[in-house]
């Protein structure tokens, strides 16, 4: 059986509202995540990611409320990330109706969180988000990756929104995450993110070819071709995008029809 490739819109939330403006015609409230997610649901999205980027962690109630409302109204898988630091945080988000939780900096700080979460809730619930940046300084034990221009680098895992290097090799960290029980890797290249010049293919392919769990490519989509490249050259199992969907440049359905026309198996 051929597994279909997934298209996943991502919504960044701050204080329960969508940030990164939206230009959807006919939305009463472009800042309401549930209304926006419902629109993507109607367009045939395979799942939706809510990323809580609220700086303060005192009030988890807001995101819990959003997740509950979304889970009540949507019939598609929902992944929630941002500020999930403990098993208790995971439990609250999953109990509110999320299908998966995405952990990032907290997993780097304490890799046991991956195994504990997988043990408690099942590997299918645990997404490890890996943010990476190119590092051109040669270092022993790092996975060398050749770029399109012939330069060689390794990819370093970064945390705290890309501001903090960890010294961890991205391919090695993705492998460890899988071994510890992650069910999926959400891979974002800091170089590509926001550029609209396409996914960072070299690292996407390197991770996809190394791990046995699904890899979601994220960061850099600007054209329909970029989705195609993510699946074919990047070997990704899913492609995630934000602004191209929020600004109405394409609908999820347009992306899927384009991909189907080029022989990529998608759920239409």
From Swiss-Prot:
Q: What is its EC number?
A: 4.3.2.10
Q: Which InterPro entries match?
A: Aldolase_TIM (IPR013785), His_biosynth (IPR006062), HisF (IPR004651), IGPS_HisA/HisF (IPR050064), RibuloseP-bd_barrel (IPR011060)
Reaction catalysed by this chain? Answer: 5-[(5-phospho-1-deoxy-D-ribulos-1-ylimino)methylamino]-1-(5-phospho-beta-D-ribosyl)imidazole-4-carboxamide + L-glutamine = D-erythro-1-(imidazol-4-yl)glycerol 3-phosphate + 5-amino-1-(5-phospho-beta-D-ribosyl)imidazole-4-carboxamide + L-glutamate + H(+)
Principal subcellular localization: cytoplasm
Q: Does the keyword Coiled coil apply?
A: no
Q: Which residues form the active site?
A: 12, 131
Q: Name one Pfam family in it.
A: His_biosynth
Question: Which GO annotations describe the biological process of this protein?
Answer: L-histidine biosynthetic process
Q: Which GO molecular function terms does the record list?
A: imidazoleglycerol-phosphate synthase activity; lyase activity
The protein's job, in short, is: IGPS catalyzes the conversion of PRFAR and glutamine to IGP, AICAR and glutamate. The HisF subunit catalyzes the cyclization activity that produces IGP and AICAR from PRFAR using the ammonia provided by the HisH subunit.
- Would you identify the family this protein belongs to, as annotated? Belongs to the HisA/HisF family.
Q: How does it assemble?
A: Heterodimer of HisH and HisF.
UniProt-recorded name of the protein: Imidazole glycerol phosphate synthase subunit HisF
Give the originating organism.
Methanoculleus marisnigri (strain ATCC 35101 / DSM 1498 / JR1)
Q: Which gene encodes it?
A: hisF
């Amino acid at each position: 059986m051929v597994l279909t490739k997934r298209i996943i819109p991502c919504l960044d939330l701050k204080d329960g509202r969508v940030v990164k403006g939206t230009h959807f015609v006919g939305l009463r409230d472009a800042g309401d995540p549930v209304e926006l997610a419902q629109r993507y649901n109607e367009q045939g999205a395979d799942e939706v990611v809510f990323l809580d980027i609220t700086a303060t962690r005192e009030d988890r109630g807001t995101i819990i409320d959003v997740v509950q409302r979304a889970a009540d109204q949507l019939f598609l898988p929902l992944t929630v990330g941002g500020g999930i630091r403990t098993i208790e945080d995971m439990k609250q988000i999953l109990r509110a109706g999320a299908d998966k939780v995405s952990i990032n900096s907290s997993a780097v700080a304490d890799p046991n969180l991956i195994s504990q979460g997988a043990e408690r809730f099942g590997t299918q619930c645990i997404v490890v988000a890996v943010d990476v940046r190119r590092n051109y300084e040669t270092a022993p034990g790092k996975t060398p990756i050749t770029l399109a221009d012939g330069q060689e680098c390794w990819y370093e895992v970064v945390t705290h929104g890309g501001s903090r290097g960890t010294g961890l090799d991205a391919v090695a960290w993705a492998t460890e995450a899988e071994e510890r029980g992650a069910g999926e890797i959400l891979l974002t290249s800091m170089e590509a993110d926001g550029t609209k010049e396409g996914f960072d293919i070299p690292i996407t392919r390197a991770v996809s070819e190394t791990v046995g769990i699904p890899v979601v490519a994220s960061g850099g989509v600007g054209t329909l071709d970029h989705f195609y490249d993510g699946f074919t050259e990047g070997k990704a199992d899913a492609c995630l995008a934000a602004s191209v969907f929020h600004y109405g440049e394409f609908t999820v359905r347009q992306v899927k029809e384009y991909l189907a026309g080029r022989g990529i198996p998608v759920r239409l």
